[in-house]
């Protein structure tokens, strides 16, 4: 896997060795092609390899925070960060904590939040509730959720029933992956 575009284009991104489903290049490309990422802050929840955050930084995001609970994945993120950004760690933060625990505790705010837990995970709704109730997403911010096709319809129905302050901005389907991009209004 490689960074697709920007100042670090072509740089290799390694992935954790076990049971991880990295975001496909075509999903990453679609996500970044619909957004203006320059000078934005990004929160990459369930970061895995850090690919979303590193792609954002390569495209001139102001800062990225990567949240991951898996110890091996966090080690992988640190390796990738060192390889891609040398010792310039002012551009990013890496935290080993669950996404929901981070969202419960943080006082940080972000312009863009990318949520990509394992497809079988149940944290989508809890994470969304924390993000909205705690005002973690800035006004006019973007929330993206990557989920499995078999969870897509239920997720959309529950979101539409529960939340009026976000609107669907874009939906892309790639095989068994669905990328839903919301705008916070």
Spans of model-derived segments:
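Class I S-adenosyl-L-methionine-dependent methyltransferase catalytic core
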Residues: 1-185
């Amino acid at each position: 896997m490689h960074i697709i575009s920007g100042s670090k284009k072509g740089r290799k991104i390694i992935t954790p060795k076990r049971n991880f489903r990295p975001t496909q290049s075509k999903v990453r490309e679609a996500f970044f092609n619909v957004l203006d990422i320059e000078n934005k802050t990004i929160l990459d929840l369930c970061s895995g390899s850090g690919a979303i955050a590193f792609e954002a930084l390569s495209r001139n995001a102001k800062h990225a925070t990567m949240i991951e609970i898996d110890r091996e994945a966090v080690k992988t993120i640190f390796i990738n960060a060192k390889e891609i950004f040398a010792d310039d760690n002012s551009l990013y933060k890496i935290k080993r904590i669950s996404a929901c625990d981070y969202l419960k505790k943080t006082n940080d705010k972000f312009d863009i939040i990318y949520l990509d837990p394992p497809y079988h995970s149940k944290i989508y709704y809890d994470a969304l509730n924390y993000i909205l109730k705690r005002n973690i997403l800035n006004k006019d911010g973007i929330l993206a959720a990557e989920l499995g096709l078999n969870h897509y319809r239920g997720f959309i129905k529950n979101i539409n029933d529960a939340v009026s302050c976000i609107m669907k901005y874009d939906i892309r389907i790639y095989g068994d992956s669905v990328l839903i991009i919301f705008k916070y209004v």
